[in-house]
Structure formats: structure tokens, C-alpha cells
């Protein structure tokens, strides 16, 4: 057991695999309790997992004894990592471009996700802590034409439609306009 404990930290790729497995297990455990990781936790996990994958593969390639093969494979891997990074980083930034705010409505704390691409929607989920939120949408506000953050903006935007959901995600009511 002591030998395994001393060996695991020396293999970064194995550590990264363990991290991914832990995240997946925690994701499913949270889902059982109707919870989800907050967006920043997912973003941090993806960043650490990507860095661990890159460093772990380079660490394994450095163990190759033939220098020519070692450096050729490292160059190929770095070129692939850069190419894939150039392709996936904009997609990742686009996927995480939605703003996230902590707000209080009717004395209840919510995590508000602003989706402002083509149409602006604000999706409210129950705030459960700095790492997790409820995974059932509680309120959805529709603001019309996209491209802005109605919560983080200094301007006040009128709500076109507000939809309220129950604990199971079923629609309770839909209110048109900026009515109470």
C-alpha cells in the first residue's frame, strides 16, 4: 500500500484520470440530490484536466530512452495540443460566455445564468453554496433580442415574459410583461 501511495503522485496522467473519475462520481451523486456544480467549478475542472492531460503525456514521452524518438514525439504532441487548443478554446469560451450572478428574489437566493446569444434569457437555479446549485430551473425571464446582460448592466431592461417552475421543473405560471 505504501508503495502505491508513493507511486501515484509520480504519474501525472494517472492523477488526472483519478481527478476525472472523482468529478464524474461527484457529478452523479449531486444529480441524485438534484444538485449540480456551479459553472466556475466545471470550468476549473476542465482547465486542470486539460493541463494534467498535456503535462501527463509529456511526462510519459520524456521516459522514452531514444532521444530522437522522444523529441520527435514531444514535438508532434505539442503541435497536436496547440492545434486542438486553437480549435477548442474559442468553442469553450463561447460555451462559458454566459454570465453567472448570485441574486435574491422574494427572499430566496438564486444563481442566475444569463444566456444572451440570439435571444436574452435569464435562468434562475436555487443557490446551494459556492460550489453547487440546484439543477432544476426555478424561474426563466425572457428579455427579447440578445447580446446583453440584464442583471449585470447598469441599465434596466424590461422583462417580456417570466416563467415560474415548481420543484419538479413543471410550469406553474407564465407572466407576460413586467408585472408583479
Locations of the language-model features?
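Membrane-interface helix-boundary motifs at transmembrane edges
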Residues: 2-8, 34-35, 60-73
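Membrane-associated alpha-helix detector
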Residues: 2-24, 154-161
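Short, flexible coil/linker elements and helix-boundary hinge sites characteristic
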Residues: 10, 31-34, 63-67, 79, ...
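Membrane-embedded alpha-helical segments of integral membrane proteins
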Residues: 11-62
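Generic hydrophobic, helix-prone segments enriched in Leu/Val/Ile
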Residues: 57, 93-94, 104, 123-125
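Internal/C-terminal transmembrane anchor helices
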Residues: 67-96
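Alpha-helical transmembrane signal-anchor/signal-peptide segments
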Residues: 90-112
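Extracytosolic and intramembrane catalytic regions of membrane-associated proteins
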Residues: 113-180
Amino acid at each position: 500500500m505504501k508503495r502505491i501511495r508513493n507511486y501515484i503522485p509520480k504519474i501525472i496522467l494517472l492523477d488526472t484520470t483519478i481527478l476525472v473519475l472523482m468529478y464524474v462520481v461527484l457529478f452523479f451523486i449531486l444529480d441524485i440530490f438534484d444538485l449540480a456544480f456551479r459553472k466556475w467549478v466545471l470550468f476549473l475542472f476542465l482547465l486542470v484536466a486539460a493541463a494534467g492531460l498535456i503535462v501527463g503525456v509529456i511526462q510519459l514521452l520524456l521516459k522514452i530512452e531514444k532521444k530522437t524518438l522522444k523529441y520527435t514525439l514531444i514535438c508532434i504532441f505539442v503541435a497536436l495540443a496547440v492545434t486542438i487548443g486553437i480549435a477548442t478554446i474559442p468553442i469553450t469560451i463561447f460555451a462559458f460566455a454566459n454570465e453567472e450572478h448570485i441574486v435574491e428574489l422574494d427572499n430566496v437566493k438564486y444563481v442566475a445564468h444569463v444566456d444572451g446569444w440570439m435571444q436574452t434569457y435569464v435562468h434562475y437555479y436555487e443557490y446551494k453554496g459556492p460550489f453547487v446549485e440546484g439543477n432544476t430551473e426555478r424561474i426563466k425571464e425572457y428579455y427579447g433580442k440578445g447580446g446583453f446582460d440584464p442583471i449585470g448592466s447598469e441599465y434596466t431592461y424590461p422583462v417580456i415574459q417570466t416563467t415560474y417552475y415548481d420543484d419538479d421543473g413543471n410550469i406553474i405560471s407564465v407572466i407576460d410583461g413586467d408585472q408583479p
